[in-house]
């Protein structure tokens, strides 16, 4: 199997959005996808890119992707990667593609002197959790992810909360 991991190109915002939608469908979260191709293109390739996307190909076929951004740990005093999305198309799972994407990102961290690669996983996604544990990931059970969005975000911004 010929595998290639490469950075997404500016003409692939539609492909990236399609992969986001495939991931959302797998996670039963399709109803939450609000992103448009224009929004994805701007985040990845606009005047102030703040997002990165690496595409995995197998034998010339798009197999999956990793969407990530640079974060910072005040504890370590160094940057790291926050992996927003990792997805391998179902027909191509079990071939090492997910591990290759994570290895690629770990390499980015090591090469740049960054301290960590971090992400979240849905608690019901047992296959992914087991896979992540098998590559040395530690589940941070003592942490709870918080989110403020929609009307609550607006209210907070206006000082009503």
Predicted segments, located by residue:
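Conserved beta-strand-loop-alpha-helix junction that forms the acyl-donor binding cleft
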Residues: 119-128, 147-151
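Conserved acyl-CoA
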Residues: 89, 100-116, 138
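A short helix-loop-beta-strand connector motif used in the catalytic cores of GNAT acetyltransferases and
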Residues: 43-55, 82
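Conserved active-site alpha-helix within GNAT-family acetyltransferase domains
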Residues: 99, 103, 123-142
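Conserved GNAT-fold acetyl-CoA-binding loop/helix
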Residues: 17-43
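Glycine-rich acyl-CoA binding loop
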Residues: 56, 94-99
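Conserved beta-strand in the GNAT
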Residues: 55, 61-70
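A short beta-loop-alpha structural element at the N-terminal edge
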Residues: 4-18
